[in-house]
Design a protein with these regions (language model features):
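Secondary-structure boundary/capping signal
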Residues: 43, 54, 113, 193-197, ...
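Rieske [2Fe-2S] iron-sulfur-binding domain
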Residues: 3-6, 45-171, 214-216, 413, ...
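Zn-dependent metallo-beta-lactamase
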Residues: 2-65
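A short, structural micro-pattern
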Residues: 40, 132, 139-141, 269, ...
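C-terminal catalytic domain of Rieske-type non-heme iron oxygenases
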Residues: 2-10, 75, 146, 152-448
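Intrinsically disordered, low-complexity boundary segments flanking structured domains
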Residues: 27-35, 55, 124-125, 133-135, ...
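Short beta-strand or tight-loop elements
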Residues: 42-44, 64, 134, 224, ...
Length: 448
């Protein structure tokens, strides 16, 4: 009788040399790919507003070579990079009071791609009526430039999230290029367990010591969102972290410096971000770092460090000495080092990876469905991302992890149930409901 041979055997490199193909459905985003066409149905950031000065800016977004500029009238244009006349790059163009001119023969384009003038043509020439420069609708918000690259007859409303309007919060834009596929960067947001190891136990403490506590974690789908709820025991308190991503590449993360030592209720976002493919092997995070007295009470954050290729959170860019990256590895190295495109078929996924699997399946289902705009209340889209720290002592002689799970579920239910509230009143109402969880005990029948 043949016995089952264990796979965990020594020196098996020879038998593990084959590298399968990547999952093209999720990772490829060029024109006419399923994920690429889905992403093009949403407004995508393409650069920072501050990058558009007196010269055009060359861009690569989802495999398309583009150029962005701000004309003399202050309008932003996002055009195909190569001039429709003879293909010269408009990154070398001349910004005009209205639109941009190609440096080669002076063809003049408006921000919408229409041809204004073809100066080398004779009077009466109709060539400008038979040509146009590819262009995409563009708009600015909170220091970022967004473009809509989908069908022109299906432009969605621009999503206005509640965390963009919180009193006393300053939004500071940033961008970080990653030398890898967009998905392995994005799905890190649904992997809260990596923080225990990468940010805490495997090197220097990168955030606070509380991150090194192993959480009780659950993942859930709420409409267009995939979320995680991670509950940690910090002395007599329970710290519940609620993070979210939304279809297809939007995400928010809670405040970074929470230590769980003092109560806080529905403390909101530390960063909002979009993970935008440049091509299939490179991507850029465009984000908004959130600063407020409440979020930065410990004085750790630094607005001066936030911008192009810079963030005030350790390990988020590739601009550190290589030896330091090896000794105290950050998110950037962990994500980029999974290969230019991570190979899902080679993974041995465990319980810590449930959120990643849930996100991948969520995206696969989205590929076969029409884009669904996020639900808004009075034009404002409610979001969930938050930190809550509530005084709930550990039960003597009982299963504390079951209590942590129950507290996390209560927090998630309260936050999600507040979607229909007036956005101006929602934070205070949710915070009051969360405060009522103080001293919560495990009810009979509740189990891990």
């Amino acid at each position: 009788m043949n016995e089952l041979r264990p796979k965990n055997r020594a020196y098996q490199g020879y038998h593990r040399r084959e590298i399968p193909r990547e999952d093209e459905r999720l990772t490829h985003t060029d024109p006419n790919t399923p994920m690429g066409e889905l992403m093009r149905r949403y407004w995508q950031p393409v650069c920072l507003s501050a990058q558009l000065a007196d010269l055009p800016l060359a861009l690569l977004i989802m495999g398309e070579e583009l150029v962005a500029f701000r004309d003399g009238g202050g309008r932003v244009g996002v055009l195909h990079r190569h001039c429709t006349h003879r293909g010269a790059s408009l990154e070398f163009g001349r910004i005009a009071d209205r639109g941009i001119r190609c440096c080669y023969h002076g063809w003049h384009f408006d921000v919408d791609g229409t041809v204004i003038d073809t100066p080398g043509e004779p009077p009466g020439s109709t060539i400008k009526h038979n040509a146009c420069q590819g262009a995409y609708p563009a708009r600015e918000a909170h220091g970022l430039v967004f473009a809509y690259m989908g069908p022109p007859d299906a432009v969605p409303d621009f999503p206005d999230y509640d965390t963009f309007h919180l009193p006393g919060v300053e939004l500071v834009p940033y961008s970080i290029r990653h030398d890898c596929n967009w998905l392995q960067v994005h799905e890190n947001l649904m992997d809260p367990l990596h923080a225990v190891f990468l940010h805490s136990r495997m090197g220097a403490i990168q955030l606070t010591e509380a991150w090194g506590e192993m959480p009780v974690t659950e993942w859930l789908e709420l409409g267009d969102r995939v979320c995680y709820v991670a509950s940690r025991r910090i002395g007599g308190n329970v710290w519940v972290r609620f993070n979210e991503v939304a279809t297809p590449n939007f995400g928010q993360v809670g405040g970074f410096w929470e230590d769980g030592l003092a109560e806080t209720f529905f403390q909101r976002v530390g960063a909002t971000r979009w993970t935008v493919p440049n091509d299939d092997r490179t991507s850029t995070i465009f984000g908004l770092r959130h600063f407020s007295e409440r979020l930065e009470a410990k004085g750790i954050g630094n607005k001066a460090l936030v911008g192009v290729e810079s963030l005030d959170i350790y390990g988020q860019t590739g601009h550190r000495p290589y030896a330091e990256m090896q000794r105290n590895t950050g998110d950037w190295e962990a994500e980029v080092s999974q290969r230019p495109i991570a190979i899902h078929a080679l993974e041995h996924r465990g319980t810590t990876d449930r959120g990643v699997v849930l996100l991948r399946n969520h995206l696969l289902r989205a590929l076969g469905a029409p884009p669904a705009p996020p639900s808004a209340v009075g034009g404002i889209v409610p979001t969930y991302t938050s930190n809550t720290v509530v005084s709930v002592p550990a039960p003597p002689g009982a299963d504390d992890r079951a209590l942590l799970r129950a507290v996390g579920r209560k927090v998630a239910d309260i936050v999600a149930a507040g979607n229909a509230l007036d956005p101006r009143e929602r934070p205070a109402i949710i915070a009051a409901r969360l405060a009522a969880l103080r001293g919560m005990k495990l009810e009979a029948g509740e189990a891990p």
